[in-house]
Amino acid sequence: MASQMHTSISSGDEGKDAVLKKERPYKIFFKDLFVFKENEIAARKKERMKNHSMKIYQKTTFSSRMKSRSHLGQLAFFADAGSSSYERLGLDPTLILRLTEGADRKRTVHEFINDQRDRFLLEYTVSTKKKTIKRFERLIAIKENQLKKAEKKLQDDALSFEEFLRENDQRSVDALKMAAQETINKLQMTSELKKASMEVQSIKSDIAKTEFLLKEYMKYGFFLLKLSPKQWQIQQSQKRAQSSKSNHILPKILEKFSINTAKGDNSIDSDKMSVSEEWSSRRGSQGGRHGKHTLGQDSRKSSGFTRPESMASEDSLEYFLEDELVEFDLLPEIYFKEPEELLQVFTELEEQNLTLVQYSQDVDENLEDVNKREKFIQDKINNNISFLLEHKHMLRMNCEREEEKAAELELRSRLFSFGEFNSDAQEKLIDSLSKKINQVYRVCIGDAEVGSLNAVQKLVKVESRLVELSDLIESIPREHVEAIERLKQKERRQKLREEKMKEKQRHQEERLKAALERAVAQPKKKLGRRLIYRSKPQSADKQELLLVSDTRSKSQDEEYFFS
């Protein structure tokens, strides 16, 4: 295979050299000397590059390649036939000579048969290769024809595409011209539309201005109609109704006008009555300090309310402004011919407004007085409520205190009645209590009715007197109360000190007396062993109930009331 590749490469190089020789006008003879060496170097380089590009399992060693080409050494018998046979077989004669230089000429029949077999195989392979080459040449020719046809078709397509491009360019140019013309037309149309819209806006603004002026003038006309007398208004409306019978709006206007005039008269009368009554009552309550002012105001008010009928019919044409602006053809007739008449009406209206302003000011003053009085009454009520709440809280605390006292007294009574009942001791205690109650009653209330009341009634009166005194103490300034309390505390402390001194002196006297008795008494002899505390019998001495006058421990209330 390598030899075949070498021969094909050499044949290709020879063909290239022949072409170059034909094309070149000069002939170089010394180059042919190095052709074989150059071809061999190129073949080795190509084979080396091929080995580099081959995969690992496709590569072979030099010995294996030489073994695969060992049959070439058996072709030495073709040397006598000349170099034409080697060329016909596609072999390189130089390679054959180099391989057959040291070959053995002696061969057997089997070797000859093998050589013939190999020759046949080689010829067969050569013939198959030639057939494949011819087939490939035919395919190449077919492909060349197809390529020529395709090239021709491409040329035709290119020509048609160029024609299409020319037509497309022409159409685009025409379209651009048409678009430019359309844009010009559009700009012209937009400019015309802008002009038309500006004209419309100006017309609308003029219409709005004229409508505004019309409304203002109609308001002025309605105002003048309001100031005109009612009879003249009715006459004008009847004239317009007769002149324009086709107009269906004027009868409704007349009907509404008559209703509004009737309502206006009634409202004016009622307003007069209510205002006069309120004015008289308010002025009567204020007294005679505003008498002159009242007369002046009444006179002005009477003059104001007896204005012409045109003044009293302010609401007679309210339907003109309440409804939308009615479109009707009316001749602009005015009742007032001279400006002085209108000025006179304005002066009357101004006087009426002044009276109303004065009346509103008086009403505001009265309202302010009423608000002040209401605020004062509300504050007084709030103070009374707070005082009553405090009094309620105080009464509740007093009730709780009295309940505690009652419970304490009940407990004391139980303790008092506990044990052996001694009527004499209780009678003595009750007598002492009644004496103390009489003393307290004389101190708190006086000597009157001392013998006619029992102890409970006296205690009730004393308690009521104490409540009154406590209320009076709350009304006394705090400084005086604190000064009195300090004096009382000082007296109480002085009394306690005196009692302590007396108690101490009495205790010393008792000690001295006991010491004298012990000194005088004979010594007692102790017989037997001393008893244990738990075995000591109770003393048979009974505790006597002490009287109130002999008690040294007093309650807090007794110290407060009797100190």
UniProtKB/Swiss-Prot annotation:
Cell compartments where the protein resides: Cytoplasm, Cytoskeleton, Microtubule organizing center, Centrosome; Cytoplasm, Perinuclear region; Cell projection, Cilium, Flagellum; Cytoplasm, Cytoskeleton
Recorded coiled-coil stretches: 128-211, 361-415, 454-522
Primary localization class, coarse: cytoplasm
Keywords: Cell projection, Cilium, Coiled coil, Cytoplasm, Cytoskeleton, Differentiation, Flagellum, Spermatogenesis
InterPro entries: CFAP_domain-containing, DUF4200
S-S pairs: none
Keyword Membrane on entry: no
Recorded GO MF terms: ubiquitin-modified histone reader activity
Location of the region described as Disordered in the Swiss-Prot/TrEMBL record: 265-310, 543-563
One Gene Ontology cellular component: sperm head
Quaternary state and interactors: Interacts with CCDC42, CFAP53, IFT88 and ODF2. Interacts with CCDC146. Interacts with TEKT3. Interacts with ubiquitinated histone H2A.
The protein's name in its UniProt record: Coiled-coil domain-containing protein 38
Organism: Mus musculus
